[in-house]
């Protein structure tokens, strides 16, 4: 197993892509600390991990927007485990918002999406970096989006902008932390039916819109949360020991960006 003895934190772990990441990390031998704001759904994640790796998952309710809560959680993981080898910043989403003309977007809605999608990754990276520096190694993976590399199918300006910011944050921290043996990369999923928000978006497309979306993907199908998770495992593992500062699209060839 590629991650035997490693300890990893996964944010946004209550369902969908975050849950799949927890399962795949544990399958490869990692001890996983899963956090989210949804306590009940976190129990589902714990059960999913337990089914493949008994005893490999601990959960905690943490709001990534709350810097103090993030710092306390990271300190708790360090106290219990003595190390943090991997950090996967999955928390994100559109915060229940829908597309509106840019002139109608309130400041509070703009900031809310940035708080979840970008500030949260900053809070966790800031808290975990000293511990990884102490160890002389570490791997951080930020879950961005095709929206951050092109545009958002949701039409939500703040979402595309925050995900683009997360890609920039990935590059900058990779440059800064590389001398300490810490790698920072990003995985940019395409459209994945992984949670209630993506299901609502899928339903809103209608049959014709769904067909057009699938037709735009080179592999002519949607991806799965597990396929995103396997890319994350690669970046956390030593298979990616000489890879940092990169954003990899896992979208079935929808965008094919250089």
Q: What is the role of each PLM region?
A:
Residues 3-33:
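Canonical Rossmann dinucleotide-binding motif of NAD(H)/NADP(H)-dependent dehydrogenases/reductases
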């Amino acid at each position: 197993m590629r991650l035997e003895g490693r300890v990893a934190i996964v944010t946004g772990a209550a369902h969908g892509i975050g849950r799949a990441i927890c399962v795949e990390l544990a399958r490869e031998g990692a001890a996983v600390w899963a956090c989210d704001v949804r306590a009940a759904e976190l129990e589902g994640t714990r059960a999913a991990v337990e089914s493949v790796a008994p005893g490999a998952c601990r959960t905690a309710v943490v709001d990534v927007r709350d810097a103090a809560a993030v710092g306390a959680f990271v300190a708790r993981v360090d106290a219990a485990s003595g190390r943090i080898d991997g950090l996967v910043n999955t928390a994100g989403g559109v915060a229940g918002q829908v597309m509106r003309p840019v002139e109608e977007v309130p400041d509070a809605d703009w900031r809310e999406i940035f708080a979840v999608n970008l500030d949260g990754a900053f809070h966790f990276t800031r808290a975990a970096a000293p511990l990884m520096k102490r160890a002389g190694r570490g791997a951080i993976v930020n879950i961005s989006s095709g929206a951050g590399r092109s545009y958002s199918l949701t039409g939500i300006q703040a979402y595309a902008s925050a995900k683009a910011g997360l890609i920039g944050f990935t590059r900058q921290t990779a440059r800064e932390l590389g001398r300490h043996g810490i790698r920072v990369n990003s995985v940019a999923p395409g459209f994945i039916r992984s949670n209630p928000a993506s299901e609502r978006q899928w339903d809103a497309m209608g049959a014709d819109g769904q067909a057009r979306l699938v037709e735009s993907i080179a592999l002519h199908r949607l991806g799965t949360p597990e396929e995103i998770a396997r890319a994350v495992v690669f970046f956390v593992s030593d298979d990616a020991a000489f890879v940092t500062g990169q954003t990899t699209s896992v979208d079935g060839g929808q965008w094919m960006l250089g």
